[in-house]
Amino acid sequence: MDIDVLEFVDKIASIESAGDTLDRLPQLISLACEKGQETQVYERLNELASKSAIRVEQLSAENNQDFSKSVNQLSVVRSELRSLQSLMADLNTDIQASGRDLQNMKQQLNSLSTSERFLTKYHNLVRSCMQVLHQVQYSQELLSKKQYLPTLRICSEISEVHLKRLDGLGMYSTIQQYIVTTKEAICSAVMEDLHEWLFSIRQKLPLVGKSCSQQIDEARRRWAREYKEDLVNLSSKTSISLELYLLEMMDFSPLDNEIVKISFEPLYICLQVHSYLGLLSSFRSSFERDRRRQQEFLAPKSLTTLDMAVVSEWLNSIAGFMIVEYYILQCIPNFRSYEEVQNIWTIICEKLVETILSVAFTEQSTTTIIKLKNQIVLLMHTMERFGFSVESLRNLCVELIDAFGGALILKHSVFFEEAFEKDVYAPMIVETQEEYDHYIAPYWNFPSEPFPRTMSFSKMCPLCCTTLSKFVRHFFMFLNDSVILATEVNEKAPRFYRRFILRSLVDRLKSLYPKLALSQMSQLVKNFYAFEDPLLQIEKSLVLNKPIHQIGAEASSSNNVKSTELLEGLANARKSALHEIFVKINLKIDDFLGLAEYDWTTTQVRKDVSGYLQEMVTYLQTMYLESLAGLPKHDKSYVYLETLDHLCTAMVDLLSDPSIRKVTTAAAEGFKLDVEYLESFAAQVPDQSIVNADSFIELRQCANLLLGDNMEEYLDTDKFMRDFNRLQPAVAIKFLERHINNYSANPLSNDRPKRRAIEILIATLKKR
């Protein structure tokens, strides 16, 4: 039992005033009910009442009066006590009812307290959810405005701060999935924006390259105007001075100017997003693949001819593409490596070189090739300005020199054809000094003579020399002001010059041989001689690196510079022309021999020379004395010997014809007469007439063998070396086998000794 409640009961019991006791009684009841000690209090009160009754009895016994008084008081007390008990019973009933209500209220209070805690918790959760939802909504607003990085920061804040409060809720996984989806959406969006940006700059690449190339070209032209005095000085300038000039004078922003503006903001945003998400490495790889794919689209789908509109746009796109790469490399550290950019540049150059070379050598327009070269040189200067290696482009320009040379040869070959067609293949007659100065003086230096003057060559020669001079001048037009190619152009000029002469001039003239007459062929030989000096002068000017307009007197006064290849080409052309001349003459000789009608079985000695020989000799005299007039002595001698040797061989073959079964002495006498006639003609031909007459020694020895009295002389070594040294044993056997039939095999015949001698000679020759 709680001491405080009992003390309170005792304190009430000690109060003498009944009113005060009653005033304290509710407080006691409330305290007892609060402590749950109603029974104990009730028992304590009964105990106090009993004690009071006992004391009263004691007091009554001691003092009756007092007792009576006390009885009365006791009665009053009892009455009050009964009232009090009744009141306490009522109070107890009320207290019990109040206790039950209080218990219910306490239970309700506990329930309310629990509910309040849950409400507070749920309130906090709802507030957290609302904060998250607010952040989600805000992130969506930012995302709709393409503010990707702030959106990612909000997603990170949700994930790292707010989302922990939602752990265990179904909303947790939803928000978590939203964050993942949002990050993926942002990645997809920035990549889509990046691809759109790449596509947009792909459309602008030609403008970027063109604008920058124009600035480079203007700077290059300023340099050329400042430094170019003449072709010699230009050729001696190094390309280093031009490069330094471009580096110093070039002040131009290729990506931010009046023509084109390109912002790297989409790339920066994409880079920041992937860096924030820790995906920078994969983004770098993806960007590298995208740029490689884009460089593949720079080249035209097909290029079968040099369409300069297509090529120019391609080259400008290449320049623009690499300029963008350069600025990405410079403006975004540690994103693109120098090796990656150089690798792409190498691939682009390889594709460019392969494609251009596949069509350049089929291009016939020299103007187009020069335009192409100028575009590539401009691309070289542009790329050098941004630090890219241009060696492959320079090599491409060197290859274009060959393509240009081939096209130039094809172009100027037409002028050769015109000169060949218009030429009369006769000595050129110069009527006036003006004509001489125009056609002759630039290429030949002849002593002064009165006009009209007859040249040894035909008009073809000065026309061809003029074409060659134009060819050389036009060849150096490839150089223009491209000093970086001066050395290669100077080196290749003599080579293409010789190729032009040997292939377009010499070989084309050779193809005309079958169509030309003998007099025309003779004139052509003289033309080849006339070509030698001017062609070597022009070549010398190229070898000595002299300007073309100084070909004349200065070149001829210098030390003689000869090209073995050129001289051999002209010499071979002359030889082939001379060969064609004697081939034509030999064919005519064969035609005359086809008219020969020898009666090898005749017994009548012929007194006159065969008619076909007389006609043939007349033809040969005309050819030798007229058609071959003007040729050098050694060339004429060459033709004489070749044609006369052919005539001798043909007549030997005529006598060796298998259809001839018998050759009589009379027929041999007639044949010898023809041989003597030919020897007489050969002796009268000028220039080495003795040598010419020797061409018929074999024929004379054949006739002497057939008409010889003593056949054994052929077997005498001394006699053979003197009279039959040109006669082959096989040929002698053929003649003797035909001649033996002229003698009878009858032992009693007078011809028997002669026949026997021939038989012995034939048998001896066959044993050799």
From Swiss-Prot:
One family name in Pfam for this protein: Sec15_C
A GO biological-process term: exocytosis
Domain of life: Eukaryota
UniProt lineage: Eukaryota, Fungi, Dikarya, Ascomycota, Taphrinomycotina
Record has Coiled coil as a keyword: yes
GO cellular component annotations of the record: exocyst
Entry keyword set: Coiled coil, Exocytosis, Protein transport, Transport
Signal peptide: none
Protein name: Exocyst complex component sec15
Family per similarity comment: Belongs to the SEC15 family.
Assembly and interaction partners: The exocyst complex is composed of sec3, sec5, sec6, sec8, sec10, sec15, exo70 and exo84. Interacts with sec4.
Record function comment: Component of the exocyst complex involved in the docking of exocytic vesicles with fusion sites on the plasma membrane.
